[in-house]
């Protein structure tokens, strides 16, 4: 865009008059006015070049507001893991893990573990957002995450730590239907949701009961 602008500047009436007069007197040095005008044109082209690069360079970090904007414009994607890639069991908050018998080779993941992993990963695009939030909210910052971000981070973490054929227990998840749906759309199908007796009639439990995926403890 800035390259196309140069010919238009050179064709302006002022520029044509100044340059045409000097072409007939090649032996005369350029006037200060001519040098100044050429310098201004060069500066304008340089500024346009920088603006163009800034607009087109890849986005490596997100602020809180930018994440909300991105999330609001996202369309449904292909999930990270295909159906049957994992044997995935989600364990809601309130279930005593000592009542569960984890297979020796099972991978046990907590959302807090995934979020902290990326808060401490300086080259991750969510590093700035998470640390800004941490500075404002302290240890309770996870409760203030933008809608949907916890699911995004859990998915990224599982992509790094899990592989096809793994048995995975995701603790303290999901807390609500919105996160459950987003997770199944973007990360992986959930094979079983383990809920405490106190939540047997909760919204998440009712949702997964329709597909016979609830186990109450």
Curated annotation (Swiss-Prot):
Location of this chain's protein in the cell: Mitochondrion membrane
Primary residence: mitochondrion
GO CC annotation: mitochondrial membrane
Transmembrane recorded as keyword: yes
Residue intervals passing through the bilayer: 34-50
Keyword set, alphabetical order: Membrane, Mitochondrion, Transit peptide, Transmembrane, Transmembrane helix
Protein name, entry field: Altered inheritance of mitochondria protein 36, mitochondrial
